Structure formats: structure tokens, C-alpha cells
């Protein structure tokens, strides 16, 4: 249960809100490089923390993330001409570079210096491993981008996709870090599945009430969930939550790692970027094919859009016969299953009506950390992780141990999570 006041604080991310101000201290994932793949390609609309923006790649390959609306008469630059190192408004020809400088005002007298007095809101950008980030906070507080494990990987070793969910970012993240639901939502019916890649393997099916151990860190928290195995051993799954909305779920042995970014478009929509990768070899064509079909880590989208094929408008393509005989949910794909649960709670869930239990330990802790960080910032206390990219050089991990001990008491487990 969360009070209405705290729920508002947690979920409102627009300009001037405490949570929006906190998030603007961090580098924000905006879109994928392949969405603006070529110099002078058409601009792309993006919405970030309630701000309507466009992203474009100029003639020299530089990326701009700028206000969608021309400062002249506020017409949309989405319709603009991306040419000769700038985006030109087609209304009166005003042209701006990736830094927001006005390069040309052909509708003004030739001897006018007015263009030196007008700027377009523009945000610094950073591009890494196929993802474009923007920094929207105070310039003097801009820190280094986060050093995620996958940041320097070549293209053949990673695959990235983006899609939109129709709800607030917080409930998206809560659905991701909740390990207890795996034993139900992603499970099979009347069938034993030892293929843990389906998230319904013996460890999850055998112990459906995991023991939680959450460890706070400077970057966020490690979320440990322990399950008993049939052999009398203990399966620990350590997932990561990083400020302010990043997650990494521990992969099953042999599977690629996946890292997700739950970026608030506004109060009621979330842009999700998922990067799946392998550190030591290229991802396979079969893996990419499965990801594109939305079978596990990624969502299948309607071609030419960011809208998932399985969505609220078609009840996530639920198959009641499959639900009766094969799948606990009747919905195909982990992403679609999760989306059905978090979106069906409403655009912004009323958390004052919840009844939380021990299985919600990670959810409760994440809310407290975000609320505390937002309130601290209002008192002038800056978030540590915002300027220290090295804090993000950690990964998720899973293992089986013989003793019933907490994961953080084992040096080898803690070492395995460091990049």
C-alpha cells in the first residue's frame, strides 16, 4: 500500500515534478541508433519525461535530440528538412543544428542578427552500442554516461529493440523485478518444463514462494530470490535494479543476457529498450528470430510502429484453450504476459488499494529508494549514481549452492556480479 501523496510523487515525471527532476539528473535512453540510421534521414518523434522531442542525425552523423516545436511559431519540426547539418522548419525556413543554434532565418532581413538571439532547446547526446542517450539536467551537473557491460560490444554480439507500454514506468519496473510471479505467470500447465529458457524450469516450478534478500547499493539494489531445489540445494537468482529505471534479470545457463531500460515517455506511457547480448560470441540468427517474434526477452511489434502485436486492444491475443491445457496465462511470450498484468492495472495504478505481501519485498524497496532520492534532491542532496558511470559496471547472476546461506555472504557470488 502506498499513500496517494507518495503515489503521485512516484509516478509524476513531467518538468518541475520531484521525480522528473530526479530523473533529469541521469542520462536518459531515448531511442535506438537504427531508428535514425543514416545522415540526413527523416527525424523521429520521441517523448521523454513529458517533453515532446525529435531526434535526428545530421549530415556529419551527429545526433540531435531537440524540442519538437520550432521556437518561431511552435510548428512541429518533425515535418522539417534534415539537410546540410541542421533541421529546417518548413514553415518559414528557420534552421537549427544539433546543439540548438539557429543557423539560418531566411524569412528575416539579410542584415538581421536575430538568429543569434534565438535558440532551440537541445540536449547533449551520447551514443553507445546502438542506443542513443540524452542528458536533460543542469549542464554543470552532467556526469559520465553509465558504463553498462554491453556498452562497448560490436554490433554482431548484441541485439536491441524498443517498444511502448501504455502505463506508468513504475509499474513496468515493478513487474520486472518481482521474481515471485515467474512461478505462475510464465509457467506451464500439466507439463514439466526443464528448459529454463522458457522461465518455467524446475527451480521456478518447485518452489513458488522464494525467500528474499535485498541489498542496497550506491547504484540501486541487488534483488536476491532463493528457491529450494528438489535435490535439497538452494537456487539463488540475483537480479539488478539500477537508478532510476534500469533492470537486469539473471539469465539461465547458456542464454544471452538481457538488459532493459524502462524510460518514462510521460506519466502514462513507458518506452522500453531491451539490449540482449553475448560477451564472448555473436548472437545467433535463431536468437534474433525468437526475439523479433516476441517469444522471450523482446516484444514483437507491428511493423513500422512501436506498438506490440499483442496489446490491450486485442487482449494480448489470449488463447483460452491454450490456457486450459498448456500455458498458465494463455498468452504467448514473456513480454506480452508481463504487459497484460501491468497495463491491466490501469495507466497509473492506485497503490492505496494494494495488499502487499512478503513476495513484494523488491517492489516495496524500489519505491522507497526512489521516493527517498526524489525527496533528498528537493533538499539539495544529489543522487550518487547520476554522475558516476562506473557504478553501473555490474551484472545479474544465478547459481546453485549447497548451504542455506544468504548470497551476499559468498565472495565468489559477489565477484561474479562485478564486470
Positions of predicted regions on the chain:
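A short, structural micro-pattern
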Residues: 24, 119, 126-128, 256, ...
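A boundary/linker detector
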Residues: 1-24, 31
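Short, functionally important structural connectors and interaction interfaces within domains
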Residues: 14-15, 22, 69, 74, ...
Amino acid at each position: 500500500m502506498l499513500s496517494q501523496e507518495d503515489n503521485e510523487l512516484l509516478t509524476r515525471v513531467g518538468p518541475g515534478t520531484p521525480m522528473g527532476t530526479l530523473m533529469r539528473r541521469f542520462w536518459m535512453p531515448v531511442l535506438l541508433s537504427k531508428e535514425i540510421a543514416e545522415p540526413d534521414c527523416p527525424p523521429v518523434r520521441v517523448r521523454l519525461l513529458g517533453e515532446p522531442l525529435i531526434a535526428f542525425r545530421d549530415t556529419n552523423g551527429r545526433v540531435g535530440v531537440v524540442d519538437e516545436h520550432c521556437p518561431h511559431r511552435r510548428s512541429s519540426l518533425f515535418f522539417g528538412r534534415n539537410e546540410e547539418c541542421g533541421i529546417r522548419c518548413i514553415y518559414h525556413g528557420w534552421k537549427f543544428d544539433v546543439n540548438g543554434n539557429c543557423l539560418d532565418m531566411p524569412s528575416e532581413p539579410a542584415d538581421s542578427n536575430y538568429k543569434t538571439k534565438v535558440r532551440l532547446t537541445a540536449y547533449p547526446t551520447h551514443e553507445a552500442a546502438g542506443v542513443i542517450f540524452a542528458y536533460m539536467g543542469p549542464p554543470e551537473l552532467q556526469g559520465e554516461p553509465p558504463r553498462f557491460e554491453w556498452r562497448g560490444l560490436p554490433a554482431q554480439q548484441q541485439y536491441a529493440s524498443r517498444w511502448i507500454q501504455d502505463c506508468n514506468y513504475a509499474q513496468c519496473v515493478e513487474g520486472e523485478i518481482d521474481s515471485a510471479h515467474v512461478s505462475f505467470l510464465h509457467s506451464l500447465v500439466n507439463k514439466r518444463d526443464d528448459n529454463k529458457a522458457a522461465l518455467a524450469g524446475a527451480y521456478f516450478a518447485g518452489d513458488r514462494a522464494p525467500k528474499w534478500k535485498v541489498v542496497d547499493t550506491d547504484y540501486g539494489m541487488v534483488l536476491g530470490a532463493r528457491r529450494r531445489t528438489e535435490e535439497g540445494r538452494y537456487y539463488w537468482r540475483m537480479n539488478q535494479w539500477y537508478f532510476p529505471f534500469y533492470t537486469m534479470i539473471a539469465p539461465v545457463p547458456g542464454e544471452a543476457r538481457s538488459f532493459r531500460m524502462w524510460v518514462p515517455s510521460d506519466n502514462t506511457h513507458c518506452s522500453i529498450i531491451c539490449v540482449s547480448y553475448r560477451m564472448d560470441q555473436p548472437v545467433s540468427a535463431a536468437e534474433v528470430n525468437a526475439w523479433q517474434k516476441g517469444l522471450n526477452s523482446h516484444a514483437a511489434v507491428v511493423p513500422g510502429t512501436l506498438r506490440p502485436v499483442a496489446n490491450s486492444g486485442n487482449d494480448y491475443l489470449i488463447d483460452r484453450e491454450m490456457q486450459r491445457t498448456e500455458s498458465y496465462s494463455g498468452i504467448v511470450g514473456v513480454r506480452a504476459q508481463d504487459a497484460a498484468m501491468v497495463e491491466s492495472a490501469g495507466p497509473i495504478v492506485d497503490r492505496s488499494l494494494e495488499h502487499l505481501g512478503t513476495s513484494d519485498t523488491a517492489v516495496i524497496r524500489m519505491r522507497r529508494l526512489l521516493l527517498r532520492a526524489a525527496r533528498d534532491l528537493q533538499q539539495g542532496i544529489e543522487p550518487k549514481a547520476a554522475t558516476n558511470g562506473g557504478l553501473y559496471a555490474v551484472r545479474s547472476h544465478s547459481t546453485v549452492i549447497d548451504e542455506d546461506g544468504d548470497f551476499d555472504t559468498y565472495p565468489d557470488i559477489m565477484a561474479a556480479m562485478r564486470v
